Structure formats: structure tokens, C-alpha cells
């Protein structure tokens, strides 16, 4: 996706309080029916208006005609976009916890070439630290930023709190979180660093009161006191405690408070840095993943995770690229970086956290390594490492792989062990760069990095981030490796290209090369031109994945399932979106600070269904009546369950008769359907189940159903539906 096309919610440049920006949930007519929609939104352009019957003969006898399915086809892609990392799946509840940097927005400015930083949270120095999300408590309590007392080399900015000489009652400060924070019965881990000012330090012992409170009523949900602290003035002291609320707050509009007795701290100055408020995390491990979001991912049964990007891998300059080694170790030693998507990245979600994520979910790692090309606020035409300096980038990638997989006798393997994981993290897949068709230099960067990495790690499968997209050159991808292609399209594109991967290797002279659909989504409704408008006009743009998205994307993925010798991976992107700040829509999962607001989209449920019913081998299917479009199908067999899965999608606005013939009697038939009131149905905060999988009751359904002893099944496939039929043999 293009980083120059940011759709940043500018109202969220101010994080203080809970300010939800205008988005699809706030101004869409959620109750509209298909009768209210314009005619062009009631059908898919590429669908043939032909409800003629379809008859499929599934061959169970000729095992030589089967192909093994792509076992890793369905997976996840994650980069920190739309606050999907900080404020998202990274469970940290405090915004701007270490005063590392601030938000910005690149935009075109009349009279200048390309884009520039047009709006920045810090008006003097773009991306520089700010006090956003923090506020003082108590009359005349002064809060400023301080660079004279750095917490660490990585974190040079602290927060200075000056208490007036007449301080009385409760004084202190609070953090409003990422547009609020969830408070519920669980254990919260709290830590922060504090330092005193020597001339003002009165050498008394201080009580630190830590609490979670309602930002609306002031009600205290949990509190803890760290008593009799002798605050030092040379080296920072790290304080830690836990909080245990015994109730669920009625909303997420809550705050984290550090407070004092004014009489105890009057006239003093303290410096604070590197705060953390961490709830219980997914599987209670060191992955630091927010439970509800991680559980939604886990429930999809993904096979891989592509990380850490995406554009966010590349940086807005080579200096601001994702430097994996800076994401390791204690949080106080992680400097963070200017992210590609308009906000500073804390890098709390670092390389070790990503690796732990994959280990906890038992999925393969698709590690994307920096390939010597960075973006720029100007646009996509960023800087590339010259060929005579590519050895630096190759060594970075080799070191990263040594960190992941090296034994403990190696430098980086020992570093991994010192961080608590002596066992290696096996890496099967490495992607070299991201969307390098935007660059004019991948023609030398790809072979340089590929050859160097292949020599050192010959068993890894390498993924090229470009092939034929750049009009000036094609990339030669060796047999056994993978091409990563990205598609943000109209629904009809996916349907018209259902057969794109049929004979793809032969047609393109790419013998032995496989394909990864690394990013995809239906991004706008069908238009006469079929051209995606990346300015995202509201009347065309799809903000939340709709039923039409799930159907069209599903058809394209059926085309991939039919070609497992070519199609290796598929991952929807972007995967996550904070409803208060988004750079890009649609996204697979939308969320805010309240876990009950996490929305699993129609596209999520499409991939959930396909991943749950994969099968081990594809089955040969002959259509003796009818053809593809408006019905699309694929059949696989699950050898462990001794079951046949038939995935059938109907993209027409009326039912289509289907007959399935098998050479033997089936013992049972079960089905699951994904559909909705109309093509534009979608899930949102206040109706999260508009488009969700539901079991098919064949005997009581308002469609014709019959089965016979010879393995014949007849059913009218409902209009606008994605279905999985399970035949128990």
C-alpha cells in the first residue's frame, strides 16, 4: 500500500481525553436495506446473470489426480499502521509512555514538490516529544518535558513535575491511555522510573499512590501505595506494583493516576520516565499481546505471521528504518523510531515479541528483512543503498537470522539466550523488502541479498517483493522461491481473476516459482472504469469489509486453493484498525480501548471459514452441467476426519440449483453459511453479528435439499452467500 496516501484521523493528534474521530460507524446508515441502495450497489459487475443449475461430479477414486493443499495458505500480516501495534495488539495501556516522539502528517503543499510534513503535533520540531495523553492533578502543579535528566541513552526525554510550595491535598498526574483504557477484574503490572531534583529534594520519604479511575466520575477502581520511597537524585529508581480491580468499569473512559499527599511533596521536583501499565496478556506469556485481539487472530487458525511490515519496515528514511536490534531488551533501552504511518513507534512490540507471538500461536514466521530501500514523506520515491554499500544491509539480515536461529555459541544466539530464549526460533520464510516495485533499484538489491542469504541459509524459502510490476524491469525469481503480490481492488477484479493462477507458472515462464498474496482486500465498490481511486471518495470507498468483500475475496482465494502448486500464502491487510485513528480502511478487525467494541469483519469470517476447512488434498471436480460464475467452488478431502469439504460461493442475487455427485454414499452432511441482508451488509460496534458464519439447517431451510444413497446431494445455493459443505464419508 502507498504510504503517501495516508488517511490520518487528524482529530486524534490530541490524545488527551477520549476523542473518537468521525468514521464509518458514526455517519453510516446501518439500517439501510437493499431496496434503499442505488442499483449499482445491488450487484457485482463481473457476475453473470445466469442462475442455471450446476452439477458437480467429485472423483474420490483417482488418488493420482489429487494435489496436496497449501498447508500454510491462510495467515496473518502485521505492521504498525492505524495504531495496530502501539495502542492495538501491543497490550500497553499508557499512551506516550516514554516521551519518545509525536504525531505528524505528510501532505501535498502548494508551491512545493511532492509531499511535506504539513501538520505535526509538535509545531516546532516534527515528531519531537510532547506531553500528549498526560495531565497534572492539583492546583498549580507544573508539568514539562526535561532533557537534562535522561532516563537512559535510548530515552533522553523525561517528564518534570514541579509541586508548588503551598501544595495541599491530592497532587500528581494522570494518563488517559489510548483514547481510554479497559478496567476489569485482572492483574495490572505497573512500573515507572523516578528521579529527584537535588536542590529541591528534602530527603524525606515519599508515598506514591497508583490508581485506576473513571475519567467521568473520579471513582477509584483499584489503588496501590508504594510507601516510604527515598527518591534518589543521581540514578533513576524503578518502582513497580500491581493493581487488582474487583469490578469492570462501565466504560473505557478511565485514567491511570500517580498521586501524592501535597504536604509531603510541596516544593519538590521529580522527573519521571518509561511508564508501563500492562494488563494480563494472551496466554500470559512475554508476547505482550492484548488478549481479545490476539485471541481473534488465534481463532482464525492462521498458519503464518508476516512481520514487521509492510511500509513500516522500510522507514521514512534509511536512518528511521526498522532496526531490529534496537527493539531488543529492556524497554528503557529501546529508543523507538518515527513510524511510517504518522506516529512514533515505541518498539515495545519488537523482534522478540513477534517471535514469541508466533511461538505461542504455533505458526510459521515470515520474517521481512530490510532490503536497502526506504520511503520518504515526499512519496514512494525514497532512498536506496548504493550497490557498493549493500554489504551493510546483507550483514544486518544475516545477524537478524543468527539472532533468531543461531546456537548459543554465536554472538546473536547468545544475545537471544540472554533475553530468556536459548532455544532457536526456526525461520522457514524470509521476504526481502516490501513492495519494491516502487523502487528503481530492486534489480540489483534483490540478487545481492538473495544470493548472500541463500548461501548462508540455503533451506529458507525466499520471497521477492517485486516481479513484473515495475515498467522498467522484471525480477528473475529462481525456482523454489516466491513472488509476493498485493491487490487492493474492486470486488469484480477478484471475480474476473478467479482463474489467474491457472497455469500461471507455464504462462509466465516461472517454472517452480510460487506466489504469496501478501496483502489484499476489496477497497472500493465496483465502478464502470474498474480503476481504484486512492483518494478514497466516500461514495465509493469501503470503510468496513462488507458481504461483497467477503464474497469477492473468497472467490479469488478459491482460485488460489485450486492451484496449491503455485499459491503458497494469503493474508488480508491491513489486519487491524483503531477506530480512533486510522490511516487505511478497510481492515480485518476494528477495535478501540473497550474489548467489547472489537469488531470481526465479514472478511475476517471469510478467512476464518476457509482456514477452518482446509482439507489435506484437492479433489478433481468435473462440472457436467453449468460453469463457473455465478457459482464458484473447490473440493478438498480431510484425511483425518474422512470428510469432503465443498466450498461454494454464489455471487448472484438469486439462488442457484446445485447438484453434487460422489461415487459413494456419504454418512452425514453439515454446512456453514456466511451471508447477510444485502451485498453491503457489514459488522460494526453496535451490530457485530450482521455477517457471521451460521450453521445451515438443510432439513428446515427455505431451500430445496435432498440426498440419496448413491452420494447425490441437491441444494439451492442461497443468493449472495459463501458456504462450506462438509460430507462425512
Where are these regions (language model features)?
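Active-site groove signature of glycoside hydrolases
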Residues: 279, 308-311, 376, 408-440, ...
Amino acid at each position: 500500500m502507498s504510504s503517501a496516501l495516508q488517511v490520518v484521523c487528524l482529530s486524534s493528534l490530541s490524545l488527551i481525553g477520549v476523542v473518537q474521530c468521525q468514521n464509518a460507524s458514526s455517519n453510516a446508515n446501518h439500517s439501510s436495506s437493499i431496496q434503499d441502495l442505488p442499483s449499482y450497489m445491488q450487484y457485482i459487475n463481473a457476475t453473470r446473470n445466469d442462475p442455471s443449475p450446476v452439477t458437480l461430479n467429485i472423483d474420490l477414486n483417482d488418488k493420482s489426480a489429487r494435489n496436496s493443499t497449501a498447508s500454510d495458505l491462510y495467515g496473518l500480516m502485521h505492521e504498525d499502521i492505524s495504531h495496530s501495534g502501539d495502542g492495538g495488539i501491543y497490550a500497553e495501556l499508557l499512551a506516550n509512555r516514554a516521551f519518545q516522539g509525536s504525531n505528524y502528517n505528510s501532505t501535498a503543499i502548494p508551491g512545493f514538490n511532492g509531499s511535506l510534513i504539513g501538520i505535526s503535533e509538535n509545531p516546532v520540531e516534527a515528531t519531537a516529544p510532547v506531553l500528549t495523553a498526560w495531565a497534572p492533578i492539583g492546583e498549580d502543579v507544573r508539568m514539562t518535558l526535561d532533557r537534562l535528566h535522561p532516563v537512559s541513552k535510548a530515552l533522553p526525554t523525561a517528564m518534570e513535575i514541579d509541586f508548588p510550595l503551598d501544595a495541599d491535598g491530592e497532587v500528581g498526574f494522570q494518563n488517559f491511555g489510548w483514547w481510554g483504557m479497559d478496567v476489569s477484574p485482572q492483574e495490572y503490572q505497573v512500573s515507572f522510573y523516578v528521579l529527584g531534583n537535588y536542590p529541591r529534594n528534602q530527603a524525606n520519604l515519599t508515598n506514591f499512590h497508583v490508581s485506576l479511575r473513571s475519567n467521568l466520575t473520579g471513582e477509584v477502581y483499584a489503588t496501590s501505595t508504594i510507601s516510604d520511597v527515598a527518591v534518589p537524585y543521581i540514578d533513576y529508581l524503578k518502582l513497580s506494583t500491581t493493581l487488582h480491580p474487583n469490578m469492570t468499569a462501565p466504560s473505557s473512559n478511565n485514567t491511570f493516576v500517580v498521586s501524592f499527599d501535597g504536604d509531603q511533596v510541596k516544593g519538590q521536583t521529580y522527573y519521571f520516565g518509561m511508564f508501563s501499565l500492562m494488563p494480563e496478556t494472551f496466554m500470559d506469556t512475554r508476547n505482550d499481546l492484548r488478549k481479545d485481539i490476539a485471541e481473534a487472530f488465534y481463532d482464525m487458525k492462521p498458519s503464518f505471521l508476516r512481520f514487521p511490515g509492510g511500509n513500516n519496515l522500510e522507514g521514512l528514511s534509511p536512518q528511521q528504518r526498522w532496526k531490529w536490534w534496537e527493539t531488543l531488551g529492556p524497554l528503557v533501552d529501546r529508543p523507538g523510531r518515527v513510524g511510517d504511518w504518522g506516529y512514533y513507534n515505541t518498539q515495545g512490540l519488537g523482534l522478540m515479541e513477534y517471535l514469541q507471538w508466533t511461538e505461542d500461536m504455533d505458526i510459521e514466521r515470515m520474517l521481512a528483512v530490510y532490503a536497502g530501500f526506504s520511503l520518504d514523506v515526499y512519496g514512494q520515491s525514497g532512498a536506496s543503498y548504493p550497490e557498493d554499500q549493500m554489504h551493510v544491509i546483507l550483514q544486518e539480515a544475516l545477524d537478524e537470522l543468527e539472532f533468531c536461529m543461531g546456537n548459543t555459541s554465536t554472538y546473536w544466539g547468545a544475545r537471544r539466550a540472554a533475553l530468556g530464549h536459548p532455544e532457536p526460533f526456526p525461520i522457514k520464510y524470509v521476504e526481502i523488502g516490501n513492495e519494491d516495485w516502487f523502487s528503481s533499484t530492486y534489480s540489483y538489491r534483490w540478487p545481492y541479498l538473495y544470493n548472500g542469504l541463500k548461501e548462508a541459509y540455503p533451506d529458507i524459502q525466499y520471497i521477492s517483493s517485486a516481479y513484473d510490476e515495475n515498467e522498467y524491469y522484471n525480477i528473475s525469481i529462481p525456482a523454489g522461491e516466491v513472488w509476493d503480490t498485493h491487490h487492493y481492488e474492486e470486488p469484480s477484479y477478484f471475480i474476473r481473476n478467479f482463474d489467474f493462477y491457472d497455469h500461471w507458472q507455464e504462462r509466465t515462464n516461472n517454472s517452480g516459482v510460487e506466489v504469496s498474496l501478501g496483502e489484499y482486500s476489496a477497497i472500493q465498490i465496483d465502478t464502470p472504469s474498474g480503476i481504484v481511486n486512492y483518494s478514497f471518495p466516500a461514495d465509493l470507498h469501503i470503510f468496513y469489509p462488507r458481504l461483497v468483500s467477503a464474497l469477492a475475496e473468497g472467490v479469488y482465494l478459491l482460485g488460489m486453493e485450486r492451484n496449491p502448486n503455485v499459491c503458497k500464502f494469503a493474508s488480508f491487510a491491513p489486519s487491524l484498525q483503531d477506530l480512533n485513528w486510522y490511516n487505511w480502511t478497510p481492515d480485518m478487525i476494528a477495535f478501540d480501548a473497550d474489548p467489547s467494541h472489537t469488531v470481526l469483519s465479514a472478511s475476517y469470517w471469510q478467512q476464518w471459514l476457509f482456514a477452518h476447512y482446509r482439507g489435506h488434498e484437492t479433489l478433481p471436480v468435473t462440472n457436467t452441467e453449468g460453469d463457473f460464475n455465478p457459482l464458484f467452488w473447490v473440493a478438498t478431502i480431510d484425511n483425518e476426519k474422512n470428510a469432503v469439504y465443498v466450498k461454494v460461493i454464489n455471487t448472484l442475487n438469486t439462488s442457484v440449483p446445485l447438484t453434487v455427485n460422489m461415487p459413494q454414499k456419504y454418512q452425514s452432511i453439515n454446512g456453514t453459511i456466511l451471508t447477510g441482508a444485502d451485498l453491503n451488509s457489514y459488522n460494526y460496534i453496535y451490530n457485530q453479528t450482521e455477517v457471521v458464519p451460521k450453521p445451515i439447517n438443510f432439513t428446515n431451510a427455505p431451500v430445496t435439499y435432498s440426498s440419496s444413497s448413491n452420494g447425490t446431494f441437491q441444494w439451492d445455493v442461497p443468493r449472495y452467500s459463501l458456504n462450506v459443505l462438509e460430507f462425512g464419508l
